[in-house]
Amino acid sequence: MPDKRIERFDPALDRIIDTSETIHDLADGFGGAQGPAEGPLWWQESGYLLFSDIHNNQRMKYDPGSKTVSLFLDGTNRANGLTRDLQGRLIACEHDSRRVTRLELDGSLTVICNSFQGRQLNRPNDVVVKSDGCIYFTDPWTSPNAPNQWDLTFSGVYRLTPDLGTLSLLVDDFVLPNGLAFSPDEQVLYINDTRRGHIRAFDVMPNGMLARASDRVFVDLRGDDPGVPDGMKVDVEGNVYCGGAGGIYVMDKTGKKLGRIVHGAPATTNIAFGGDDWKTLYFTSRNHLGMTRVRIAGIPVPVGKK
């Protein structure tokens, strides 16, 4: 693995990450050029990490106790982003089936969304759940989905109510909407536009919709090194972590770049906070899983029964 380091752009980074912290390589060999490792998700009550191996159509499990990776599920419809709802159920964005699903506590699978206004979704990419139970997800249009009369012709960001009864289109002018994350107070929703190389930010209205007039570029993450904005997470103090050119960038809540985690693997695809204290930062890349430690806990995902 090439040189690994944590770069400080601003002294404020020292409160967030120790620049001498080790960046660990945990596993590799996933997906390769055909499709990346993606969607890391910490399963708190069981103490393991799930992640997607998209090309191999598998969900994998990393056990930090034994430091081993094992097959968790074979046959995922090439799922990408993962999260949990308020009951601790697994929510997955499935590429091949072009839908969002929920794994029930009894092991059955529920399709929670597969169309908008009678037209099939494109390829749902990433997903996050708000504290009121609403599910927000991105659905980029990609060239393999040649449009026909039943297809959507735009990339969308959506909000689905907890009862699954109302699906609202929030934004439709992204080139490729990808990772998304809320600020700690859920007053702001950050959404990547991967093709444009930046993160956009929207104020969230009391009804859960986005204030379109508040749309702004939060930060531009283009650069000469490999990598584009992809998966994204936020810590409890509002600092934003996102893959970009050359590694994982850390921004404060104003969008100021504080530093970069250069982990040596090409193209960071997604990140997740985990560990008992939510201070372990896991990341996936094209075919690699790694981690480092941070000083400020990430926003936890909901936790179910053990």
Sequence positions of predicted segments:
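Beta-strand-rich domains and repeat architectures in extracellular enzymes and scaffolds
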Residues: M1-P11, I17, E21-Q58
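Blade-edge beta-strand/turn elements of extracellular beta-propeller
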Residues: P11-D28, K67-G75, D106-G118, G156-L176, ...
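Beta-rich, blade/repeat-based domains predominating
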Residues: I23, G29-G47, G75-E94, R98-R99, ...
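Residue-level marker for isolated small/hydroxyl-bearing positions within beta-strands
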Residues: S52, C93, T138, N192, ...
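Short, solvent-exposed loop/turn segments at conserved positions within beta-propeller repeat blades
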Residues: I54-H55, H95-D96, T142-S155, T194-R195, ...
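A short loop-to-beta-strand structural motif that recurs across blades of beta-propeller domains
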Residues: Q58-M60, R99-T101, S155-Y158, H198-R200, ...
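Short loop/turn segments immediately following beta-strands, especially the blade-tip
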Residues: F202-L210, V294-V301
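Blade-level signature of beta-propeller repeat domains, shared across WD40, Kelch, NHL, RCC1
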Residues: T269-K306
